[in-house]
Amino acid sequence: MKNITQLTAAALAICSFLAVTGCDEQKEISSAPDSSNAPAQATTAATTATMNKDDADKIAEIDIGAEKLENGVVKFLSSWDLNPAEGQPVAPALEMFQSQFGGRIEYVNTPWDSRYDKLAVLVQADDSPDMFSAGDMDVFPKGAISGMFDPLDDYVDFSSELWAPMSAVNEQFAFNGSHYVGAVDVEGDCVMFYNKNTIRDNSLDDPAELLAEGNWTWETFWDMMTKFCDVDAEKYATDGWWFESGFSLTTGVPYVGMSDGKIVQNLDNAMIEKAQNFMLNMNKNSLQFPKAQFNWQVQPRRLADGKTLFYPVGLYAMYPYNNYIQDFANNQEDVMFVPMPKCTDADEYYLPARVSGFSLIKGAKNPEGVAAYLNCAMATRDSEAAVEIGKRQAFDEYNWTQEQWDMYCLVNQMTAEHPVIEMYNAVSSNVADLVNNPMKEAYNSGASWTQTRETIRAAVQAELDTANKKLAEKN
């Protein structure tokens, strides 16, 4: 489990600096922060952060034929800044962008919940920023359909050797040969957090050890749940809002995805039905935390109390500033996690995935600068400096254990091998509403999936037909 490749280890370095989106965009709260007092457009002047000399020298050795940009300022519309906070190290991609291309990032601040509203206002006013994060997994196809983003192909050579490692992933964000996302890395989207004390106190097999043995599967997961759960003692197997989708994606089949250049729904797929039946049986056996009895409020603290066995959520929960890991155990070193269990009937170990990447905003004034930054991100993602910076931050700032670091890298390695990207949130709000809650009904309410899909299939297909037509009109 600890034989992690350098390429995979670099994922944490990238995630630490590029994928900060997880801090805001994946919260499990039911309401977003109030943004009514936000200014129409707050910007932070482009600055040049610095890196220590040893790391900077390593970045300088990476040669991609960089030439100084005529316009070095890239305006980044986001709720988070690519420039490091005071006292934090600069990301390898940003260091390369600054030192080799003479580039800088100008942060255009927007509240996360209204980022698309602000984007539309700026595009319509011919005041477009340049770059937008694709880490929320909702840029494509929605952003392409709405005309908020331009293809990157005139500026980024996706067929080049530099971009070869992400070729298959980037094709999932392409239509008729036009790429709307420059994905530079794949990350695990959902993992199973647990308290090692709870595992020990209940004489259960450690999931991390089961994974190392190649035996972390739906079946061993089921055995653990049935041994642990006790309704009278209020002991339940899973909590949170991430389980249903994350578990289903281990089948290798998303509810909505891309196939042969079209947006498709897979509601009738037999593998999805298997996942739904598994979750229905969880409900019938009272294994899942009954959120309905608690006003639909999740209870992450129960993990520390030994009352909940697993808390499935994004890897961003490992960062202390997100205020999750503190609820999982009284001591951080007792927190552990594993990927979602393998679907035994699947031909590979598929895992839910998200990407670190960016898109080119419609009417951007500096597309060349966006391309240069993306090339820097690709060139540095497996660099020695990226690995070392990521490790230092994980151990020195976040107080991770070696075991946690190794598992983080392993999850990202496994996800990169067989990623499954869910797109029902990326087509339209109607599609999201039609799929998101219904696909959770078997798990939460004991509803039959065969009946549920009958009530949504026609409406989902009609929405996808409309989306495909609009997408075709853009090309």
Give the positions of each predicted feature:
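C-terminal capping/gating helix-and-loop segments adjacent to ligand/active sites or protein-protein/ligand interfaces
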Residues: 352, 387, 405-475
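Hinge/lid segment of periplasmic solute-binding proteins
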Residues: 45-70, 111, 135-190, 219, ...
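Short, solvent-exposed loop/beta-turn-alpha elements that line the ligand-binding surface or hinge
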Residues: 153-165, 210-213, 254-274, 326-328, ...
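Extracytoplasmic/periplasmic solute-binding protein
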Residues: 75, 174-186, 190, 200, ...
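Glycine-centered hinge/linker elements that transmit conformational signals in sensory
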Residues: 223-225, 261-293
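Extracytoplasmic/periplasmic substrate-recognition and gating elements
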Residues: 326-394
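A structural signal for short loop-to-beta-strand junctions that line the ligand-binding cleft
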Residues: 65, 121-122, 129-130, 158-200, ...
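Conserved N-terminal structural module of periplasmic/extracytoplasmic solute-binding proteins
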Residues: 9, 23-141, 381-385, 399-402, ...
